[in-house]
Amino acid sequence: MKKIIVATKNKGKAKEFKEFFASFDIEAISLLDLPESIPDIEETGTTFEENAALKAEQISERFNTAVIADDSGLLIDALDGRPGLYSARYAGEPTNDQANIEKVLKEMQDVPDNDRSARFICVLAIAQPGKETNFCTGYCEGHIHSKQKGDHGFGYDPIFIPKKYDVTMAELDPAKKNQISHRKNAIDQLEKWLHTI
């Protein structure tokens, strides 16, 4: 079985990547699975692409192997695209999903239902030694619910209702969520690069 490093320490993302890559007969190894401690890579980029590339390229260089990294976030139209690049730490450091959700709900409390459109974005960077870094981008369109619902998933899943559904991502069965998520949509595009790994 082929192996690929996924440059994340986020347990939720690591679990999703492992499930996605298993269908391609590829073992996804997260930074949490490695025997050595990897310091956090500072996300100093000004775009999702730059942040994903920073992580993928640094880890690829360190281990001299193919690495996939993602940078993802929630873009809310009524908040001019916030939390955007700062989705994980929207309420400040250290990162806290509950605090982030509460901040978004507070900022959205007076926004009418028809103005609550939002989308998740996932940008994947594929870095390999001696090769140009490639990118795949996936989206999941939907809107922001007025309150939290559900206990599956992570991040903003309890307040995000995907298009064509009437429940939040956190209320969906994890297998169903993985079929429609922004990460899955990005990974679907990634398939064309997998033969080069």
Swiss-Prot record:
Positions that bind substrate: 8-13, 72, 154-157, 177, 182-183
UniProt keyword DNA-binding, yes or no: no
Entry GO MF terms: dITP diphosphatase activity; ITP diphosphatase activity; metal ion binding; nucleotide binding; ribonucleoside triphosphate phosphatase activity; XTP diphosphatase activity
Pfam families: Ham1p_like
Reaction(s) catalysed by this chain's protein: XTP + H2O = XMP + diphosphate + H(+); dITP + H2O = dIMP + diphosphate + H(+); ITP + H2O = IMP + diphosphate + H(+)
EC number, as in UniProt: 3.6.1.66
Major enzyme class: hydrolase
Top-level taxon of origin: Bacteria
Biological process terms in GO annotation: nucleotide metabolic process; purine nucleoside triphosphate catabolic process
InterPro entries, sorted: dITP/XTP_pyrophosphatase, ITPase-like_fam, RdgB/HAM1
Coiled coil stretches, renumbered: none
Cofactor note: Binds 1 Mg(2+) ion per subunit.
Cofactor: Mg(2+)
One GO location term (cellular component): cytosol
Keywords: Hydrolase, Magnesium, Metal-binding, Nucleotide metabolism, Nucleotide-binding
UniProt xrefs under NCBIfam families: PRK14822.1 (NF011397), RdgB/HAM1 family non-canonical purine NTP pyrophosphatase (TIGR00042)
Quaternary data: Homodimer.
Summary of the function given for this chain in its UniProt record: Pyrophosphatase that catalyzes the hydrolysis of nucleoside triphosphates to their monophosphate derivatives, with a high preference for the non-canonical purine nucleotides XTP (xanthosine triphosphate), dITP (deoxyinosine triphosphate) and ITP. Seems to function as a house-cleaning enzyme that removes non-canonical purine nucleotides from the nucleotide pool, thus preventing their incorporation into DNA/RNA and avoiding chromosomal lesions.
Similarity section: Belongs to the HAM1 NTPase family.
Protein name: dITP/XTP pyrophosphatase
